[in-house]
Amino acid sequence: MKVIDIYNSLKDSGKKGFSIEILPPVKGTSLDDIEKSLLPIIPLNPQFINITFHAPVRKFINENNVTTLVESHPRTATAAVAGALKRRTGIEVVPHLASAYYTKLQLEDFVIDFSYE
C-alpha cells in the first residue's frame, strides 16, 4: 500500500495513525539491532517506517600539502534496509533523503535505488 493510500484510509475512517522513524545502521553494523528495537512496536500497527538518508559527511584531508574535500556516508544502504524491513515486517517503509546536498543525477540514482518493490 502506498503512503498516500494509508493517509486517505485514515482520513476517510476518522482514525489516527502513527509512524516510526529510524536511522539506517552505521557502516559495518547489522540490521539485527534495529529489528530487535522494532519488535515491541510492531504489534501496535504503525502505518509506516520512515528511514532517514542523511547528507554526506564532508571533511578536508591534507596529504602531502594537497588539500582534498572528501565525502563519506557513515550510514549507508538505506534502500537495502528499507526493502529488508518491508519484507520482514510487512509494514510500508518510506526512505527519505536530504536532497539539498545532492546533484540532480545523484538524486535520480537514489530514486532508482529506492525502487525496491
Model feature map: region roles:
Residues T29-E35, S99-Y116:
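Glycine-rich anion/phosphate-binding loops
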Residues M1-I20, K27, K86:
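N-terminal amphipathic alpha-helix/helix-capping segment at the start of soluble metabolic enzymes
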Residues K16-P24, Q47-I51, V93-L97:
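Hydrophobic faces of well-ordered beta-strands that scaffold small-molecule active sites
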Residues P25-G28, L44-T78:
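Glycine-rich, proline-tolerant flexible connector loops at the mouths of alpha/beta enzymes
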Residues K2, E63-P95:
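Alpha-helix-loop-beta-strand connector modules within alpha/beta enzyme cores
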Residues M1-I6, T29-I34, P40, V57-K59:
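N-terminal glycine-rich phosphate/pyrophosphate-binding loops that anchor nucleotide-derived ligands
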Residues N8-S13, L38-N45, A80-G90, V111-E117:
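Acidic (Asp/Glu)-rich catalytic clusters
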